[in-house]
């Protein structure tokens, strides 16, 4: 009995000592704890609201790179020019490739400037809704949000589908989808993501609420330490359950880390089942667009990555799949959609020097080459 009491007391005392050490360490390093916290309750609440439906929206830090003074809705979409009195509204959708129009990483706004020059000649309004890692399922839902929440009814949609979208659909979004009467109504964010990721906002939300709502440094430290304990314990408990107890395919899939290598694996070693699933998400997106009576025309744009060029295969790793080919196959049954296939154009251009057209990731075009797509 005494041994049991001694062990319990020692355990609790150890926990208390650890807590006190963590408290003082956190207190004296408090300024470093909130580097990624939201800067305002307005952006925090906006981000939480729409991420519940469409998994994630733009990071608050991206607003620092916008070509104009940002508004909170720029977390979801950016109005390139005023829509008032315009005869046509053009909506750009897609991932960071399309986001690059208004958020270039090198502060070179060539694409945005070319779009603006065009709108000065025509009565056309442009909206850029491109967001990092947006693929057809998320774009599908984004259309509803823009229409229902912001009364944006585009006449023309230019949708970019990236080579990485097949990986995003199969790894990030597949098991987070919510359907109602066979209609996709949301892609839920992972509340306790099992790995560090750009879209692990559940922890950032908690930190931001403490940062923005609590002014007293001692209370802020107390709440922060408690939050970290609770979040860490819950995350560890979920991980243990999924790894050792659950037999659910969904639980097992959520242990997978959707890092770059996993996302790109579909291009290196494509599987028929994953290609079919991805094709189905594209068909679902096209079906959604076709249901929008205000949409007159849709263009789907695809482009290669550097590894699609034979001479650029690195360390024996080559891409066996090109998403552009999947789009071509699908659109044989959808003649009302136009595919702008830059894979076909660029890969067959013997005069192209493709060494100088990329950003460091070898997936995105640099701003100078990116601007070529908006010249005509």
Regions found by a protein language model. Name each.
Residues 87-88, 121-124, 152-157, 229, ...:
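Loop/turn elements at helix/coil->beta-strand transitions in domains of secreted/extracellular proteins
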Residues 3-10, 357-376:
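Histidine-centered active-site loop/cap adjacent to the catalytic His
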Residues 8-25:
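Hydrophobic membrane-insertion alpha-helices, especially the h-region
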Residues 29-118, 251, 264, 349, ...:
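Membrane/wall-proximal cationic-aromatic binding patches
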Residues 163-328, 342-348:
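Serine-dependent acyl-ester chemistry module
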């Amino acid at each position: 009995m005494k041994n049991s009491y001694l062990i319990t007391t020692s355990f609790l005392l150890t926990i208390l000592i650890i807590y006190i050490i963590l408290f003082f360490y956190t207190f004296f390093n408090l300024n470093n704890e909130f580097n990624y916290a939201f800067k305002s309750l307005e952006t925090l609440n906006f981000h939480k609201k729409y991420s519940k439906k469409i998994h994630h929206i733009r990071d608050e830090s991206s607003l620092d790179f916008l070509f104009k003074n940002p508004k909170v809705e720029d977390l979801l979409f950016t109005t390139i020019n005023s829509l008032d009195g315009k005869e046509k509204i053009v909506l750009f959708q897609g991932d960071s490739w399309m986001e690059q129009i208004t958020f270039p990483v090198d502060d070179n706004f060539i694409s945005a400037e070319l779009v603006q020059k065009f709108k000065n000649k025509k009565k056309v309004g442009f909206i850029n809704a491109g967001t990092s890692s947006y693929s057809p399922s998320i774009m599908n839902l984004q259309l509803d949000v823009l229409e229902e929440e912001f009364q944006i009814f585009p006449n023309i949609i230019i949708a970019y589908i990236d080579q990485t979208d097949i990986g995003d659909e199969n790894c990030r979004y597949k098991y987070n989808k919510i359907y109602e009467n066979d209609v996709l109504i949301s892609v839920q964010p992972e509340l306790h993501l099992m790995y560090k990721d750009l879209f692990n906002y559940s922890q950032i939300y908690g930190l931001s609420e403490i940062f923005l709502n609590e002014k007293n440094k001692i209370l802020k430290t107390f709440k922060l330490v408690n939050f970290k304990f609770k979040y860490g314990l819950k995350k560890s408990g979920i991980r243990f359950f999924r790894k050792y107890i659950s037999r659910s395919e969904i639980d097992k899939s959520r242990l997978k880390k959707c890092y770059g290598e996993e996302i790109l694996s579909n291009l290196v070693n494509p599987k028929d089942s994953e290609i079919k699933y991805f094709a189905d998400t594209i068909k679902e997106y096209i079906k959604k667009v076709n249901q929008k009576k205000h949409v007159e025309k849709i263009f789907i744009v695809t482009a290669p990555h550097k590894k699609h060029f034979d001479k650029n295969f690195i360390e024996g790793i080559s891409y066996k799949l090109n998403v552009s080919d999947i789009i071509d196959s699908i659109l044989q049954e959808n003649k009302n959609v136009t595919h702008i296939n830059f894979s076909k154009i660029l890969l067959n251009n013997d005069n192209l020097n493709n060494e100088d057209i990329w950003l460091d990731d070898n997936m995105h075009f640099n701003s100078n080459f990116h601007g070529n797509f908006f010249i005509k």
